[in-house]
Amino acid sequence: MVPSREALLGPGTTAIRCPKKLQNQNYKGHGLSKGKEREQRASIRFKTTLMNTLMDVLRHRPGWVEVKDEGEWDFYWCDVSWLRENFDHTYMDEHVRISHFRNHYELTRKNYMVKNLKRFRKQLEREAGKLEAAKCDFFPKTFEMPCEYHLFVEEFRKNPGITWIMKPVARSQGKGIFLFRRLKDIVDWRKDTRSSDDQKDDIPVENYVAQRYIENPYLIGGRKFDLRVYVLVMSVFAECLLWSGHRRQDVHLTNVAVQKTSPDYHPKKGCKWTLQRFRQYLASKHGPEAVETLFRDIDNIFVKSLQSVQKVIISDKHCFELYGYDILIDQDLKPWLLEVNASPSLTASSQEDYELKTCLLEDTLHVVDMEARLTGREKRVGGFDLMWNDGPVSREEGAPDLSGMGNFVTNTHLGCVNDRKKQLRQLFCSLQVQKKASS
């Protein structure tokens, strides 16, 4: 399955046109024959099992009608369990769109993500040299457990005293994670997994990754945080939120699902910043050049991670995907990729969060373009910017420099001022004029 030809990164974000195997060859075809076909339908039939902000956005979209049970649908925002059980034997007409790629887990399972990134780094070193391969050095040293246990022990003994973190490869929201510094802790864990496997031969041992813990995270007010950036494959969500740890440095897991278990958790108090606020804060502390370098490095994470799976993602024109990238910044302003989520939470934790996710989802639907209004030549749709088209995309000549930094030519606006409503009005008015002129 192929993500759409345009890997777009969300409001306040950047867009990526995916590498070849991740292209939707029919993206540009949304305009003519498909458009006429869709205009003949009275409505777009949608289905979803997610009762959150997404449902509100879908129900309020003009011309969209909800279908339930096994009724025919044109657009299905499904969960990954449905995909796993039904995708291979579900017939879909050409116009139908579904919200996941068949093997999205090549990027979203922690062990597969690391495996693909390591393989891609070696490929770059062979084909383009060490300098280019070094652009993949954005994930901590990681080992899959238990199959790489002996390699891990060798690395552990080379660097005594550092902290490691163990994560289940297929779980989310901070479940099953623990920190350790002693080899005895991992030996005990290994014994536990072996004994449970001996007792139940039909249940496989749950795989983990052992990952070097980032011990010098950037702190704001003494608090650790990570960034959640939404990436639509097809742009980077610019008004994405900065997930701030709710306690001081003793809170190691900055996942909002974990923060909600804190006794003093309050959804309206300082748990999240917008990325725009974060960027302004960093610029005041470190200057615009350092901040531009940081955000350029974050853009590199999106591009290289998608390129790492271009040979393994199954291409399908029916599919798109909204990924949630979790990124940690260290004290040297270096970004680290922690994980990629196939089902980022679309449930709002506050009114501000609800408004942000509403904009994110509305723009996602604009880019997926079930209504066939786009031409396929757009570089920006609402909060989404086209960032990659078999190579980096430059800003249009005469476009304002929203970063305020000058000489910023890449078509990316992560954390910049984002008047998406004005942009959408201008875009759809222009498309309407073009349509009338051609009819």
UniProtKB/Swiss-Prot annotation:
Pfam families: TTL (PF03133). It comes from the Eukaryota. InterPro entries: TTL/TTLL_fam. It is an enzyme of class 6 (ligase). Keywords: ATP-binding, Cell projection, Cilium, Cytoplasm, Cytoskeleton, Flagellum, Ligase, Magnesium, Metal-binding, Microtubule, Nucleotide-binding. Its cofactor is Mg(2+). A protein binds at Q173. It catalyses: (L-glutamyl)(n)-gamma-L-glutamyl-L-glutamyl-[protein] + L-glutamate + ATP = (L-glutamyl)(n+1)-gamma-L-glutamyl-L-glutamyl-[protein] + ADP + phosphate + H(+). The record marks Q173 as: Essential for specifying alpha-elongation versus initiation step of the polyglutamylase activity. It is found in: Cytoplasm, Cytoskeleton, Cilium basal body; Cytoplasm, Cytoskeleton; Cytoplasm, Cytoskeleton, Flagellum axoneme. Signal peptide: none annotated. Mg(2+) 2 binds at E339, N341. ATP binds at K167, Q173, G174, Q211, R212, Y213, I214, K224, F225, D226, T254, N255. GO terms for biological process: flagellated sperm motility; microtubule cytoskeleton organization; protein modification process. L-glutamate binds at R248, K272, K357. SUPFAM superfamilies: Glutathione synthetase ATP-binding domain-like (SSF56059). Belongs to the tubulin--tyrosine ligase family. PANTHER family: TUBULIN POLYGLUTAMYLASE, TUBULIN POLYGLUTAMYLASE TTLL9-RELATED. Probable tubulin polyglutamylase that generates side chains of glutamate on the gamma-carboxyl group of specific glutamate residues within the C-terminal tail of target proteins. Similar to TTLL1, may acquire enzymatic activity only in complex with other proteins as it is most likely lacking domains important for autonomous activity. Mediates tubulin polyglutamylation which induces establishment of microtubule heterogeneity in sperm flagella, thereby playing a role in normal motile flagella axoneme structure and sperm flagella beating pattern. Gln-173 is the main determinant for regioselectivity, which segregates between initiases and elongases in all tubulin--tyrosine ligase family. A glutamine residue at this position is found in elongases TTLL6, TTLL9, TTLL11, TTLL13, TTLL10 and favors glutamate-chain elongation, whereas an arginine residue is found in initiases TTLL2, TTLL4, TTLL5, TTLL3, TTLL8 and favors initiation. This is Probable tubulin polyglutamylase TTLL9.
